[in-house]
Amino acid sequence: MAEYQNIFSQVQVRGPADLGMTEDVNLANRSGVGPFSTLLGWFGNAQLGPIYLGSLGVLSLFSGLMWFFTIGIWFWYQAGWNPAVFLRDLFFFSLEPPAPEYGLSFAAPLKEGGLWLIASFFMFVAVWSWWGRTYLRAQALGMGKHTAWAFLSAIWLWMVLGFIRPILMGSWSEAVPYGIFSHLDWTNNFSLVHGNLFYNPFHGLSIAFLYGSALLFAMHGATILAVSRFGGERELEQIADRGTAAERAALFWRWTMGFNATMEGIHRWAIWMAVLVTLTGGIGILLSGTVVDNWYVWGQNHGMAPLN
């Protein structure tokens, strides 16, 4: 007899469009509700809109587009304005930061890193504007600021790579270039210059939390899908009248590993696992070159690497 596994299949039930909170809200500030999308319904809610951008949202989108446009123009220039070459070599093009001799100067010529500085400015404005928008939207809805703080952890790693560490090292040349393969080359070279990042304990912690995040996400997703036949994905019903879904899910994990997370606790585990990926990763990058020149030598001094 066939079973309903609910791994790929999705039942889409459509009712009236949900406008969200409308009490004491000026609906003129929101976009109208768009159509329903079957494709979006495979991944989440099929309803499009309403969308609220606000001043920070508009600023972020504009700055993000300018960042994308600046890099795109440079790649187009590197391709000699040839569309065939542009498509062929897209992954090889790169917008590099200023050379070491320019230090932290903003006076580098456009073709020698000046354009990288301009692109980085737009990216800085775009990311921080979007973070501010995330914070203010949560505040407007009376929610906690958990999403904004989690986003801040990712911003921390990005800031360390592109701004904080280069400033501490005294040169924009320490920053990451904009490009596909050049980004990978920078990562490889960074590890070689600083004596193998595998001996950086914060790098190890970051990888451990990354694996942990993947494991927790898979465990949580699989558990809810496994009890969806009992209504386990219907959060309101599970709060008011749990039925058998929550109990079966909890019992499964007690049978499997001796204890189970709670409906709330699993999300606390998940957010900390995810946040610590970029938090510890940023610390590891920041210490490289500023505090520890060679992680292999550091490992030798601390009994983590062979002495010969």
Curated annotation (Swiss-Prot):
Q: Which GO terms describe its molecular function?
A: bacteriochlorophyll binding; electron transporter, transferring electrons within the cyclic electron transport pathway of photosynthesis activity; metal ion binding
GO BP, one example? photosynthetic electron transport in photosystem II
Residues that hold a ubiquinone according to the record: 253
**SUPFAM superfamilies documented for this protein:** Bacterial photosystem II reaction centre, L and M subunits
User: What does the sequence similarity comment in the record state about its family?
Assistant: Belongs to the reaction center PufL/M/PsbA/D family.
**NCBIfam families membership:** pufM
Q: What is this protein called?
A: Reaction center protein M chain
